[in-house]
Amino acid sequence: MLQGNVICEEDILTSVCSNLNEIVMKTLHINANFDFYGLKSEGYYTIHNKNKSFEDKRIDLNMRLYFNEENENEFLYAYILWFSVNPKKIGIGSLIINEIIEVLKHLTNIEFIIIHPKDKEVKNFWIKNKFIEDHKLNSDKRININTRRILSYYI
């Protein structure tokens, strides 16, 4: 809904979810049914897909969009909590991640995306998709995540 001349965050989140549904339908032919939940007062909203699989295809995405504390009407960064796709090793995950990045670039004002890879194979996937080890983010007070081993992608 419009508030004055400003588009509110729920409209942005609805658009992000709609675009993610289109990406997954086009790529995997799954109605992923992306949705969001959370409260602005918590500092972030979580986006996730309710439908995870169809036949031998599967996608699971869970990410948060965090607000900028200096401007509470804008998102500062996205934190991908979980991303998994099947089939693997044929480029579908990379295709989907790159399209997600494009959606976030066009619909939000986020500065960067972060991920905390669970193991070396996962880390290599993200590095292949242009995420980098960035130690300066470890001391960035704007990030509400207490982890040291994060990869980032700057928008």
List PLM regions with ranges.
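A conserved beta-strand-loop-helix scaffold within acyl/acetyltransferase catalytic domains
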Residues: 57-73
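Conserved acetyl-CoA-binding loop-helix of GNAT-fold acetyltransferases
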Residues: 90-103
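Conserved beta-hairpin
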Residues: 32-62
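Conserved acetyl-CoA-binding loop of GNAT-fold acetyltransferases
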Residues: 127-136
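Short, high-confidence coil segments that cap the C-terminus of an alpha-helix
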Residues: 108-110
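Conserved acetyl-CoA binding element of GNAT-fold acetyltransferases
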Residues: 73-86
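Conserved beta-strand-loop-alpha-helix junction that forms the acyl-donor binding cleft
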Residues: 114-124, 139-143
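Short amphipathic alpha-helix that is part of the acyltransferase structural core
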Residues: 1-40
